[in-house]
Amino acid sequence: MSQSTQAHSVSDPLFPIQSFKLGFTTCHTAPAIPHLSTVPLDDAALGIHKNTGKLKHDVVRPPPPIRPAPHPEPERAWEARYFQGSCSPKTEIPGGLGFYLAGPKDLAKALEGGAKEAVFSYRMMLDKDWEWVKGGKLPGMYGGIGDLAYRCSGGRLYERCKCFNLRLMWRPGGQGEVYAYTPLNDTNKKVLLAIPPGGQTNSDYGISTGRGAWNFEPGVWTTVAERVKLNEIGEANGEVQLWINGACVIHARGLILREDETSHIKGMHFQTFFGGHTSDWASPKDQYAWFADVSGVVIR
């Protein structure tokens, strides 16, 4: 890979880091920066695979926000449709969207080659009349050993030491959190539950991390950026960091995200739905969300 180059500062919340080796963005207004390539919002260009069932992610022109964004508004976005009564993709009425995103070939190759630290980011906007119900999932980073990295969610217990999944969630009233699936050990549990303003274990499911550290707002563009730093084998020095609109809201240090050198950052689990998996989580009406300006960089 190329040598590090100065990147965006926090003034551009898609890239809240000081330098990177290699990166991409689908943001059409991103400035020309060495080693940052612009790619279309397209399945082939972004290495999209394992699309969930019949769920679509059509590229559309999103509606205008209820107030201007501090950045140029995206002209193209994936549209997620949450049908009335929909919740988990495994239920009778599926909703949202779901797939895995590896990024362009050069970035995917760098990740599979053993990159230790990366950031993935996107902008999202919820319907202006959004109803939260009990909560739902939003895209986040994932990784692990080979195909064991997939489906590191849904209450999975087997081979949990060989994967991690760091999707986000919204909760009642728009409270945000990282819904963390990590190797099952006391070190990770202690770190994740200590992130302010508070955490919660969810039986065999993920750990709610930093619930209420920020609030989503319907009808406006929100920029999400997530950083994963893998731990050295045998050390508890992994990190997960999250920025919302350029502000760091969660920074978990001292994690064990892997126990084997072959466990890698894979990209993004680009999934969103209402749930939970029971009807009390379901969307009360047809609702929509839009996802745009998908980006990713390898730091080292």
Residue ranges with predicted function:
Residues 1-222, 226-300:
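Low-complexity, Ser/Thr/Pro/Gly-rich disordered linker/stalk regions
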